[in-house]
């Protein structure tokens, strides 16, 4: 169920619309459109949902500025670092106020400092907007920013960490 709707019972058209309107995505490869500027990449989600208006354009710029990209919003992806590109992808995932944000290895190509900045910002924005977020990562250090950890091994759920102390012990390398 998503927002009270049975996703399995939906038609393909309904599922596509639901994904486009209610789910934000960011992946290991940021999948930015190379010939669109940072702000145009973010606005793309609103354009696809036919919701790009003046307020949406302002929100795109505010979100990029909040992510430290005010000076880069008119740059093409190839003119930005990996961390900057990933922050553009985060802005794009959040611009349409989705109910759920999925992040698949969002820090895989980043150095530790940049990875922390990206995940901390991402988690902060998700909490601030009162959204649900799911992050897939092999980097246990990134679990510092989450509320719950589901540990998988060989495709099976082996443990759920829910308490802050339990999660921080996992982050510090106590168990994994």
Regions found by a protein language model. Give the residues of each.
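ABC family nucleotide-binding domain
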Residues: 1-145, 149-152
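Conserved beta-strand-loop-alpha-helix hinge in the C-terminal portion
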Residues: 156-176
């Amino acid at each position: 169920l998503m927002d009270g709707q049975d996703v399995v019972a939906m038609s393909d058209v309904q599922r596509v619309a639901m994904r486009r309107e209610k789910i934000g995505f960011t992946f290991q490869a940021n999948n930015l459109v190379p010939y669109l500027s940072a702000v145009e990449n973010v606005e793309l989600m609103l354009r696809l949902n036919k919701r790009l208006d003046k307020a949406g354009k302002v929100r795109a710029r505010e979100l990029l500025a909040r992510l430290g990209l005010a000076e880069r919003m008119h740059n093409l992806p190839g003119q930005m670092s990996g961390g900057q590109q990933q922050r553009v992808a985060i802005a794009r995932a959040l611009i349409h106020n989705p109910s759920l944000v999925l992040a698949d290895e969002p820090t895989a190509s980043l150095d530790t400092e940049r990875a922390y900045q990206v995940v901390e910002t991402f988690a902060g924005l998700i909490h601030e907007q009162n959204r649900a977020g799911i992050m897939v990562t092999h980097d246990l250090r990134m679990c510092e920013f989450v509320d719950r950890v589901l540990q998988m091994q060989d495709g099976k759920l082996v443990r759920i960490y829910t308490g802050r102390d339990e999660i921080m012990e996992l982050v510090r390398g106590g168990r994994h």
